[in-house]
């Protein structure tokens, strides 16, 4: 089996001192199809059949979610930083491993798969799931490329987050 982790580069002190950044750029450049295949395999055929659309979190989540949406014939929903989507939007503040932000999405309906690149502290995933529900969606599943759980106290009261790679 292909070791996708070997294509991820560790960058110390980025984007700020004390952060170890997992750079997925080499993985996407060299093994994009295999990466999407690994993410796709996190759900079985029955689970995929229940998903109406795939929500990708800005910005690397867009890359993964849009490719999955194309592969599975699903809609694609943007979850963006504040001020990047035209109204109407629903917004929610959230915490990052190195700051604060506000996520927004346009209102809608349907059953969503949430996709992001990394599970670190869980702040972005918690906010995205809550935001999606406020915007009118039902969250069925959540997947990430990398699970690096920086917060050992991370709690998720939904179906488990599935990850292609664990650190």
Language-model features: locations:
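Short Gly/Thr/Asp-enriched flexible loops that form oxyanion-binding sites at enzyme active sites
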Residues: 63-72
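Short glycine-rich phosphate-binding loop at a beta-alpha junction
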Residues: 49-58
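Generic enzyme active-site microenvironment
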Residues: 56, 114-115
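Short, glycine/charge-rich flexible loops or terminal/linker lids adjacent to PRPP-binding catalytic cores
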Residues: 74-113
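Acidic, divalent-metal-coordinating active-site segment for phosphoryl/phosphodiester hydrolysis
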Residues: 116-129
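Conserved acidic residues
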Residues: 51-52, 110, 140
């Amino acid at each position: 089996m292909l070791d996708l982790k070997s294509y991820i580069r560790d960058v110390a002190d980025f984007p700020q001192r004390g952060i170890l950044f997992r750079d997925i750029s080499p993985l996407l450049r060299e093994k994009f199809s295999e990466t999407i295949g690994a993410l796709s395999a996190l759900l079985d055929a029955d689970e995929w059949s229940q998903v109406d659309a795939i929500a990708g979190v800005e910005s690397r989540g867009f890359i993964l979610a849009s490719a999955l949406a194309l592969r599975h014939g699903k809609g694609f929903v943007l979850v963006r930083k504040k001020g990047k989507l035209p109204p109407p939007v629903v917004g929610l503040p959230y915490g990052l491993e190195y700051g604060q932000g506000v996520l927004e999405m346009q209102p809608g309906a349907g059953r969503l798969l949430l996709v992001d690149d990394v599970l670190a502290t869980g702040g972005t995933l918690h906010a995205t799931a809550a935001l999606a529900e406020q915007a009118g969606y039902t969250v069925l599943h959540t997947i990430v490329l990398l699970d690096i759980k920086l917060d050992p106290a991370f709690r998720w009261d939904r179906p488990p987050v599935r990850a292609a790679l664990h650190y």
